[in-house]
Amino acid sequence: MKIKDVVCAAGSTGFYFDDQRAIKRGAGHDGMFYIGQPVTEGFSAVRMKGEAVSVMIILEDGQIAFGDCAAVQYSGAGGRDPLFLAKDFIPIIEQYVRPMLLGREADDFRGLCAQMEAIEVNGKRLHTAIRYGVSQAILDAVAKATGRLMCEVVADEYGCTVSQTPIPIFTQSGDDRYDNADKMIIKRAQVLPHALINNVQTKLGEHGEKLLEYVKWLRDRILTMRADESYQPVLHLSLIHI
């Protein structure tokens, strides 16, 4: 089944873009906002809404496959790709990715992805967000075109089997690392809480004491509030380079 068209639409992510460099330089909190001036290219504020691009692949029988291009919270920092703004990158998808996909048979996930991954713009690979979202859409398109689930396509093309048990998912608390940890415990999240440890004074402590205090609280909270002893999640905390 051939790909008839590729359409893009701007959208919002579930989280935010934060200027990590500005935070390292002392940008403070005021509720959900960060106070201070951004320093990383492309940022209009230290915290901005996360932007996404939905990529829709339209098959010749009218089915529509979807993929969402989205970038990480700390875009533009630590060697990451630049801030992902829909207005800047929809034209890239339309100019470089869409022509590659038009008229192609939607029957080879890995092959189509390899060709998409090989595209370069001004000597550089496509933004990671584009590769992330377009590969999703290609996977969905191949699944719909061949009457399979996306997990079945992956299993078939990589020579593996579909898991019979749920795959553990890593959940992220954001700044509200206490109340949101409670929500994770109630819902039996398998890996938690990330916790966004991005400030020495308020979250880490000069000698790590605040982080240690939080880890002890989290351990005790799980042991005290879990529904039963079978719930033993993996603890994973993320510290930015502070």
Can you describe what each PLM-predicted range is?
Residues 140-144, 148-214:
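Glycine-rich, mobile lid/loop segments that gate access to catalytic sites or pores
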Residues 179-186, 216-230:
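Acidic (Asp/Glu)-rich catalytic clusters
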Residues 82-96, 205-221:
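Well-ordered, non-membrane alpha-helical segments in soluble/globular domains
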Residues 107-112, 150-153, 223-237:
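Flexible, glycine/charged-enriched surface loops at secondary-structure junctions
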Residues 1-54:
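Short, Gly/Pro- and small/polar-rich lid/capping loops
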Residues 240-242:
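Conserved small/polar residues in nucleotide/adenosyl-binding loops
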Residues 53-61, 65-71, 180-193:
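Short beta-strand elements
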Residues 58, 64-148:
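Metal- or metallocofactor-binding catalytic centers and their adjacent structured scaffolds
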